[in-house]
Amino acid sequence: MSTIFQDLVDSTVIKNAVQGQFTSLVSNNLVVSKVNSLHLFEIEKIQKDESSFPLDDSLQNEFSTSIIDESQAFMETNMHLIRTNEQTTYVLRLVSQVKVFGTITEISALKGKGSNGCDLLIMLTDYAKVSTLEWDMQSQSFVTNSLHYYEDVKSSNICSSHTPTQLLVDPDSDCCLLRFLTDMMAIIPYPANEDLDMEEAAIENSKISSSYAYKPSFVLASSQLDASISRILDVKFLYGYREPTLAILYSPEQTSTVTLPLRKDTVLFSLVTLDLEQRASAVITTIQSLPYDIYASVSIPTPLGGSLLLGGNELIYVDSAGRTVGIGVNSYYSKCTDFPLQDQSDFNLELEGTIAIPLTSSKTETPFVVLVHTSGQFFYLDFLLDGKSVKGLSLQALDLEINDDFLKSGITCAVPAGENLVFLGSQTTDSYLLRWSRRTTNEEVRLDEGDDTLYGTNDAEMDDMLDIYETDESVGSKRKIAYENGPLRLEICDVLTNIGPITDFAVGKAGSYSYFPQDNHGPLELVGTAGADGAGGLVVFRRNIFPLIAGEFQFDGCEALWTVSISGKLRNMKSRIQAQYSNPELETYLVLSKEKESFIFLAGETFDEVQHSDFSKDSKTLNVGSLLSGMRMVQICPTSLRVYDSNLRLTQLFNFSKKQIVVSTSICDPCIIVVFLGGGIALYKMDLKSQRLIKTDLQNRLSDVKTASLVSPDSSALFAKLFTYNETLNAKGQIANGMNDSASETDLDIQPNHKTSNNDQMGYDQSVSADDVPEVDNTIVTEKNVSNLDQESLEKHPILFALTDEGKLKVYNLADFSLLMECDVFDLPPTLFNGMESERTYFNKESSQELVELLVADLGDDFKEPHLFLRSRLNEITVYKAFLYSNTDKHKNLLAFAKVPQETMTREFQANVGTPRDAESTMEKKASSSVDHLKMTALEVVGNHSAVFVTGRKPFLILSTLHSNAKFFPISSNIPILSVAPFHAHHAPQGYIYVDENSFIRICKFQEDFEYDNKWPYKKVSLGKQINGIAYHPTKMVYAVGSAVPIEFKVTDEDGNEPYAITDDNDYLPMANTGSLDLVSPLTWTVIDSYEFQQFEIPLSVALVNLEVSETTKLRKPYIAVGTSITKGEDIAVRGSTYLFEIIDVVPQPGRPETRHKLKLVTREEIKGTVAVVCEVDGYLLSGQGQKVIVRALEDEDHLVGVSFIDLGSYTLSAKCLRNLLLFGDVRQNVTFVGFAEEPYRMTLFSKGQEALNVSAADFLVQGENLYFVVADTSGNLRLLAYDPENPESHSGERLVTRGDFHIGNVITAMTILPKEKKHQNAEYGYDTGDDFSCVMVNSDGGLQMLVPISDRVYRRLNIIQNYLANRVNTIGGLNPKSYRLITSPSNLTNPTRRILDGMLIDYFTYMSVAHRHEMAHKCGVPVSTIMNDLVELDEALSYM
């Protein structure tokens, strides 16, 4: 069997983060690492509306008192001061996202060690591979400077092979340290440039490259530092030392809670200084007899210095001289240690797993430490000083009166992210960018500032005001307030959504379609459990975007449509997009086009056709738009271009000659571009003074143009930076005068007077006098037009992007028609920059690769960036993201584009693929007079996004967010979409309208409740508790979820008595979980009913079972089965229960129609041991009880009767059924293949797995008539097994045979098989036939993955592609893609990874240039279209979701 492993949804958990200046010397970057990807963010300061920030009552009162009464005059004028509605905040903007062929363990930063003075990124992958990465501005990615490999190092400690690793960087970036194998340390020196070899630095005209900025590394054992150092717990570098100094926490003698009466305080703490030149070390001091439960140390920045030691029950500070001071945070510390501690046991904290982050800024005199508990609680620790020494510690909880309780679970990493910024990364909840401030009390503010509470509301705002208004007399008092360490306030600036860990999932009907029982063919969605603890909930995945249709009607013969907003007044151009949805004076028109006629309707509550207008209805319409910010409407027809005023009266008419066939058009206020067949191009520009179009023939400057697009420079800050930076380097005269109108007209052969004699402009234009054109009086300045004065007096000059027949991209600034960029684009290289040329080969002639359409548009939500879109003949969309890079020779910014990886196949399936040499004949068959229909449409506002809609048989919506690159989302539509346009109405705000091939026009709303920053759209539903299992009831169309919440735990015996009473008032009770079964409606995603289990009883497994309720009729009925565990402490045996629930119909609550279902308990059976898994087998209920598996029958619909059982391995964690075949996964003994029979009842053991595995999930995989088993273990490995008694390796069928194995890097938690959809069949090229299934799986890192069976022919082709890419792809960190997928455990196969292909590597095929694609296809002996068809088939395997 041949398969391919693919990622459907990227992992979302964040394991590590680091802040630095990676992209430039003035940037503030944050790099976060997920399982196998790096995300580089830019922390940007923006202004946001204050309404988006939740304020507590106290702050609201402060803000309300700061508003000045409008009745009070200001300086005896009519002006009044009011508080602005904008507030300064920070956001994370994604710069780059790269995949890594390795599991990222840790990352860190080397300050200032890059070739341009920027920081280097240090990445630790797998177990002991250290890579040095540097940001490359031209390729917009990280490049590898060095790779250090230490996995061959052996340790004398036999128990250290699976110990965690640590990656540390000295505060002065002098060296990097890797701790691995518990007590082994690899040190990589990074000296300053002046300390490098002088002979190397003296080379003429040479610069010291960062690639050689390190010296040879060396490995030390802990015993080489000091003979007593062993069993290291934690290592940190210390601040404030000239030489790199280590703080080592270790425990040579081990103890436990049981042996505390014999051995206490076994932890030691040593300060060791390193001599990198001599590779020597010296111990400065050692502190002994520290509490045994200390597990980590935190280095405190200067000026304080020292270390903070974290234990389960205490916090201890150690200064540079070895003096200690500590506190106990619960009542048990005195029983665990004899170390002297101050009593702060009222907190009742258990600090295991707590993350500590030291913070400091210019506003605080000394650093302080923020502690984040595993429950999500915040505490902060202040150091009480006596002179320069610390005399005590003060621990305080975060004041929830001035802070939101937003964190419901623990975090995994925390890093300072700039001045007063901190980033918290988590694996169980969302990650947050926070701004912190140590606010002063209101009393202190009033004492120093009187009644002025404006500066007391927010320290960040106060500093901004001080920078503007402070005087020498006021500096002292105001700065004194800023240095006061008052209560800590945390403000959420940005959130990175996390949906992991996912432990279970179910497939059900899409929520908004769930209450139509007569329709059983609605769209499906995948619903999984998300998060942990208080951050638990559900996550809803959909592969496609389902249009929410707000209205529809049929218009026979309609082929295209447009919407345009017209106003009779000149408005502010800068806010034209927002004004379209808020200005009541705007009128929106809908233009429909048939083959030979057009129609125009006034869009409102209804569509009313416009009568008595000059709008051309006797011709087909090619494009419609507006000019002069909505004052003019433009209609482009095959034979003419027409301009209308706000009353739809014709003001200008330009006729095209009969030989001029319009290929493409683009409208961008105030310009129009028309491209004709044969390469001709014409520019029409609106003159603001006369409000008339002026035509310019660009044939002398541009020729052989295939398609073109215009984009406004005002749409993005990128173009503003490009022009602003470059204009400052020009002559002052050019800056002052610019390119005035007359000069531009002279350069472009335009007549200064507007009475043109152009033959293309017909007589109708001559009959329109200048008096008939309404003019705007700019001489009168009023309150309404004062803000528009500058915009009205200046012209906008769009940027022209043109694609020529030779495949060249030319970019012009229409302000002076200067060439900004020219390069070859036909080869689709990874980056586009000025002057780039590609080598032409005979392969490039294949018609399917020919580019036929170009579009430049903005993508994004709150932050929009320009993108270049190129479409090939078979609808393959290539997206490039614009960026700027500096040219040091010319001292100017240059425009460039970087290719965005295509994660979804937009290309259409090409039937009847010919031979590899069919390209030339296909090109010859294509008539030169044909015109390709334009399919890409820019939607300026759809929901909260700027997007691009791709029409056709496979419609797509291309979206980008602040935290993601451009993503391709298929639109669910069985009928090809012909045309689309933005549309705004009361019932469809910021939506869109489209027409399909059946002439149905539909008005759609955009689903704002979904997130679009991953490969699939998803929606996170918070339930506020841990979710352990989920099942979907298909007839009632609701979800049953097993949940658990923590409560205080009391030890009781089997009779319920409390044998241990609490005698000490300072003692407190621990927490334990108790569970319930909740019914969740997919219509509102709320809990509509619950069943509470017994105290401390938690659900472990929830499943839908169709049980046989009649032996005569064999009738089956769906039930919800639940397996639970009852844990009451180590003194009482664990018990469990098997529950059976029926979902019944009831009268819904008033106003809540979703509450029409309730849970009804059918039966409960309690047994010894936990019930870890339940499932159905051929109409019977199966439950796994430890190592025993029991099959039960439902009798009389009220009780269960056991009919068969079997003893398996140690503890059954997974059970899957396929008819009467069963597959069980054990916690340590691999999988077991079992059969079940009814007459007589028996369970037969068929076969077992060969190796001892910790199985995390397992399931069947079907390909036609072949049956296989997919097994995932806790080490992140995936195995494909088969039952083959004829194979000698199976020992006559006693052992399952391994067909392939594959390292994933994630722990798979659940999997199931889903049908594989196949729409295309081609026997010649070996496409799949028969009934195939895909194995869909979820993992603990928030990802969704799939294992897809493929035919042998497809496997051979893609295997050649994989081997080619493994040697050609420039991998991040210098890692080998093939070695990453190898499993380290022994296997009987000579080639263990055979038959499982790496989808992440094969995805690079679409990223490669066209020439490389043809080279790979040539090695396979097939055309590129065949390879692309293979990828399309795989991409559409779950197209019904």
From Swiss-Prot:
GO terms for molecular function: RNA binding. Keywords: Cytoplasm, mRNA processing, Nucleus, RNA-binding. One of its GO terms (biological process) is co-transcriptional mRNA 3'-end processing, cleavage and polyadenylation pathway. Residues 753-763 have a biased composition (Polar residues). Residues 741-763 are annotated as: Disordered. It is found in: Cytoplasm; Nucleus. GO terms for cellular component: cytosol; mRNA cleavage and polyadenylation specificity factor complex; nucleus. Pfam families: Beta-prop_RSE1_1st, CPSF_A. The keyword RNA-binding applies. The keyword Cell cycle does not apply. Disulfide bonds: none annotated. RNA-binding component of the cleavage and polyadenylation factor (CPF) complex, which plays a key role in polyadenylation-dependent pre-mRNA 3'-end formation and cooperates with cleavage factors including the CFIA complex and NAB4/CFIB. Involved in poly(A) site recognition. May be involved in coupling transcription termination and mRNA 3'-end formation. Belongs to the CFT1 family. This is Protein cft1. It comes from Schizosaccharomyces pombe (strain 972 / ATCC 24843) (Fission yeast).
